[in-house]
Amino acid sequence: MKQLNILLSFLLIGLCTTAQPLVNEADVLRGSLNENRDWFDIKRYVIDVTPNYEAKSIVGVVSWKALAVKPSKQIQIDLQTPMVIDSILLWPNVNDGMNAVRLEFTRSNNIAIAQIEKQIPKGKQFGLTIFYHGVPKEAIRPPWDGGWIWKKDSNGQPWMSVACQGLGASVWYPCKDHQSDEPEEGAQLTIQVPKDKNLIAIGNGRKVAETNMVNINNNNRFSWQVTNPINSYNIIPYIGDYVGWKETYKGLKGKLDISYWVLRSDSAKAVEQFKQVPKMLEAFEYWFGPYPFYEDGFQMVQSPHLGMEHQSAIAYGNQFKNGYFGRDL
C-alpha cells in the first residue's frame, strides 16, 4: 500500500508538471532583452491619455526620449492586445521638434517591430511618438489581477485607475516593458477628463499644469511629473471625485511635501487616519534611511483596490483602518 501511494504521488507530480503551459513567443519577446530592445536606453516618457468611462476605452499618445547604445535599424515597442497602435513617428534629432519620420511597423502578439530606414548611430539621442487607442484589459481582482480599473464611488461618480505590476505597463501604454530600463530623466503623465463630471486626475510626482480644453474637446487636462528614475509599471493615473490637502514633513533630507487625495465622501475619516503618515515616515527613515524621492514629494492617493507602492503616489485602499482591513496579519 505504501509503495502504491508513492507511485500515485509521482504520477500526480508528473501530471501537474506536464499540465504547465510552456513559455511561448510572446513571453520571450516581452521578457528578453533581444536585439530590438537592447540597443537603446530609455531616458524619459511623456504620456497623454484620455479615458472614456462609458466605453471602458482609452486614447493616447506617448513620446519616448532614448539613447542609442549601439546602432540599429529596428525597434521593439510593447503594447498588449487588444490595444491598437495607430502610427509611430521617429524624431532623429530629439530636441529640434522637426523632421519627424513616419515608421512602418508590424504587430506580433503584444509587440510592434518598427523599421528605421536610416540607422541610428551609437551615442545618438532620438525620440519616438506612438499614437494608440483601444479597450485595455480590465482588472478583475486588482491589484493581484492587473489592468485598467473602472469603478464608481458611493455617490455614483466614475473612479478609475490602473494596477499592472504583474502584467506590465504595456497593458495600457506603449513602452519598453522591461524592468531593467527605467527612464533616468523621469516621466510626465497628462490625463484628460470631461469637464462636466468634475473629476480630478492625479499622477506621480508633482502637478506641473492644469488646463481647460473647453474650446477643443471640453476636457480638463492634469499634468504630473517625476524627475527621478521610475519603473514603467509605477506610472499610474488616478481619476475620481477627489479632494486633497497638504502638509510638510521635516525629514532627514529637509522639507518633504506630502499630499493626500481621497474621495469626497471619505474625507472626514481620511483626515483622521492619515495623521499617522508623518510618524510612519519618521519610523521608515529611522530604520531604512531617507525617503528616496524628496524632489517628487510624497502622495497618498485613495485607490479602487487594496493598494500598491506606486512611486511618489502611493495607492491606498485599506478602508482607513489599521492593519489589513482593520485586523492584524
Place the predicted regions along the sequence by residue.
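Bacterial Sec-dependent N-terminal signal peptides
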Residues: 1-25
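N-terminal, polar/Ser/Thr-rich
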Residues: 19-61, 86, 153-157
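Beta-strand-rich interaction surfaces with strong enrichment in secreted/lumenal proteins
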Residues: 47-50, 64, 101-104, 115-120, ...
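Ligand-binding face of N-terminal immunoglobulin V-set domains in extracellular IgSF glycoproteins
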Residues: 55-82
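A surface-exposed beta-strand-loop module
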Residues: 80-151
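Juxtacatalytic substrate-recognition/specificity segment
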Residues: 191, 223, 241-329
